[in-house]
């Protein structure tokens, strides 16, 4: 363990929930790949990683179980999903519109829907970053990728 190496080296989603649609699974795979490639993940009060993160749902709560690269327990944080419900619902609705639009809509229509999708995704990312404050310090890009994974879990669950 390198002191100050505040990054994720592995991310696992609760696989007991099952798989989703090919589009959602693609989003999951891309988010995990991008997250591992570049992230800032600092569990407060811990000297450094890299870290392994298991994200799951338990009793309608979001669970972040953090371990060291070697598997030692670091922390488990449980967050209420309530602040995310509206954002995730809106995000799913606009994603459905986006996936429909890319099949038949004009480029300007697709771009407009995509801008709305990114705006809602940014809102969810900031909400997640705020909810993790005081527990885990993350940058905005890391929060974006983590929010994508929260949506995947929500979609499956």
UniProtKB/Swiss-Prot annotation:
Coiled coil: none annotated. Belongs to the UPF0262 family. It comes from the Bacteria. InterPro entries: UCP032146. This is UPF0262 protein RHE_CH00582.
């Amino acid at each position: 363990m390198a002191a100050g190496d505040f990054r994720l080296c592995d991310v696992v989603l609760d696989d007991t929930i099952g798989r989703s649609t090919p589009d959602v699974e693609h989003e999951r795979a891309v988010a995990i790949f991008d997250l591992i490639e570049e992230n800032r993940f600092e569990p407060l009060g811990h000297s450094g990683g890299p870290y392994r993160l298991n994200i799951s749902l338990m009793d309608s709560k979001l669970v972040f179980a953090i371990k060291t690269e070697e598997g030692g327990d670091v922390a488990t944080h449980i967050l209420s999903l309530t602040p995310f419900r509206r954002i995730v619902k809106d995000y799913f609705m606009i994603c459905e519109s986006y996936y429909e639009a890319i099949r038949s809509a004009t480029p300007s229509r697709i771009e407009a829907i995509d801008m709305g999708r990114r705006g809602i995704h940014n809102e969810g990312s900031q909400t997640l970053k705020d909810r993790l404050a005081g527990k885990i310090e993350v940058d905005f890009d890391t929060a974006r990728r983590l929010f994508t994974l929260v949506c995947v879990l929500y979609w499956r669950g």
